[in-house]
């Protein structure tokens, strides 16, 4: 679970269909860029782990200091989820995940799809997907939809 750092007033604005303008000194903004969402998030990474398992045994050899072993080994693969904690910033120009590992900075032109969940939001940029666990996935989705509407107005 993730505890929110988004002010309650900002969350209410987003739910009402308005984009709040938030301030931070942690993110370097481009000209005309405004922050509309700041919150703690966890980037979930699916990692494939390979293990080598050996089945067999060994016995003392004929001469001192030697061993005789027999058996066979095989590689076993399994996937596990790795959590990368950080801060998710959504501005009117880009989506930034600031973290020590697996951080990213993406502009909206590369955003392909959004899948909201109750406590997460999956964002796809081309062939790369990021599953971001947040306090409220519907708020993240609402911010992205509002920005999308504003960007389509000529």
Feature-to-residue mapping (PLM):
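Domain-scale macromolecular recognition modules
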Residues: 25, 33, 43, 76-77
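N-terminal Sec-dependent export signals
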Residues: 1-32, 36-38
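Flexible coil/linker segments and helix-coil junctions enriched in charged and small residues
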Residues: 46-77
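Acidic, Ser/Thr- and proline-rich intrinsically disordered linker/docking segments
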Residues: 5-6, 27, 37, 42-58, ...
């Amino acid at each position: 679970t993730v505890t929110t750092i988004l002010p309650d007033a900002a969350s209410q604005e987003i739910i009402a269909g308005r984009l709040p303008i938030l301030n931070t000194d942690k993110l370097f903004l481009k000209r005309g860029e405004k922050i509309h969402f700041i919150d703690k998030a966890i980037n979930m990474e699916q990692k494939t782990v390979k293990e080598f398992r050996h089945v067999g045994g060994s016995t003392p050899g004929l001469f001192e200091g030697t061993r005789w072993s027999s058996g066979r080994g095989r590689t076993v693969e399994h996937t596990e989820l790795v959590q990368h904690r950080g801060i998710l910033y959504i501005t009117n120009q880009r989506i930034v995940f600031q973290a020590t590992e697996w951080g990213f900075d993406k502009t909206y032109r590369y955003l392909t799809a959004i899948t909201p969940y109750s406590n997460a939001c999956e964002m796809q940029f081309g062939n790369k997907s990021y599953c971001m666990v947040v306090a409220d996935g519907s708020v993240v989705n609402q911010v992205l939809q509002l920005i999308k509407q504003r960007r389509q107005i000529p």
